[in-house]
């Protein structure tokens, strides 16, 4: 496997060379499809995955010192390419910042590692404030993107914590994810499923996935007994007592008659999205009834 990966990646590097310092047109520009492999998610996902790939293959006899040099040189180019070509906004920018921060945390041998961590963590802190509205709803109004955004923001912070580098993140970083976590709790049906509001892909958010995320939220906020209750499938923690919740910034209004597996729920969607952006659909007034 290691030899095959080295052969494939070596060929890829020769086929798609990157000249250091190259910048590309802004996202959505008319030349955006040129050099696509060096833009946006493509580079960020390579950086994140290559950290895992290196640790997986480095014990192989085929992972020679010569190849290590090639790999690390290419890795540094990838990170610096991201830094020169950040998106202005959106989930792709979050992944770019995540990749740069992860590189700084997990590849401390690089001379720019501290810069990578500082820059990446700062951008993640800025994006938490921009991507979650005042009531905690993600600005794309898509439940699956909402859950994914919490995960992206937290995973990078968690890796920093495990490596004693969380101090590089802005003050109050983790606490800003508490309202978003509670929104997931409030909009989840009694059978641990969610509705297909906007572009939500509810089939990807089944019971096991939601419980896994609630356990992650319980790890983030160990003193929050309501989240613990959701994470434990109602076996421990404290049952919420409120029966209605209005997310007035995000435009989700939730009613229920109780908090057990026999509960009835109604959710009304009335998102404030005047520019028809991203993953929100123009169907305000849609409601769902769970019984």
What is each residue range found by the language model?
Residues 1-178:
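Aromatic-lined, polymer-binding surfaces characteristic
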Residues 133, 137-291:
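Carbohydrate-active enzyme catalytic cores, enriched for enzymes
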């Amino acid at each position: 496997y290691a030899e095959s990966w080295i052969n494939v990646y070596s060929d890829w590097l020769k086929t798609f060379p990157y000249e250091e310092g190259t910048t590309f047109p802004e996202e959505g520009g008319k030349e955006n499809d040129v050099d696509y492999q060096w833009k946006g998610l493509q580079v960020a996902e390579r950086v994140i995955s290559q950290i895992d790939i290196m640790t997986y293959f480095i014990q192989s006899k085929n992972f020679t010192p010569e190849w290590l040099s090639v790999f690390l040189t290419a890795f540094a180019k990838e990170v610096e390419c991201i830094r020169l070509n950040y998106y202005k906004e959106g989930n792709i920018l979050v992944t770019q910042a995540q990749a740069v921060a992860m590189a700084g945390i997990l590849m401390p041998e690089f001379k720019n590692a501290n810069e990578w961590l500082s820059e990446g963590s700062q951008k993640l802190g800025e994006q938490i404030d921009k991507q979650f509205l005042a009531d905690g709803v993600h600005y794309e109004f898509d439940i699956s993107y909402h859950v994914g955004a919490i995960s992206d923001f937290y995973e990078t912070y968690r890796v920093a914590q495990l490596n004693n580098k969380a101090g590089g993140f802005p003050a109050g970083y983790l606490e800003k994810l508490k309202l978003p976590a509670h929104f997931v709790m409030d909009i989840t049906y009694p059978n641990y499923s969610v509705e297909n509001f906007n572009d939500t892909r509810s089939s990807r958010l089944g019971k096991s996935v939601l419980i896994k995320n609630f356990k992650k939220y319980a790890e983030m906020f160990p003193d929050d007994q309501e989240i613990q209750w959701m994470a434990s499938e109602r076996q421990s923690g404290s049952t919420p007592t409120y029966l209605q919740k209005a997310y007035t910034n995000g435009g989700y209004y939730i009613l229920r008659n109780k908090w057990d597996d026999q509960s009835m729920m109604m959710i009304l969607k009335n998102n404030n999205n005047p520019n028809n952006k991203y993953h929100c659909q123009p169907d305000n007034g849609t409601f769902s009834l769970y019984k």
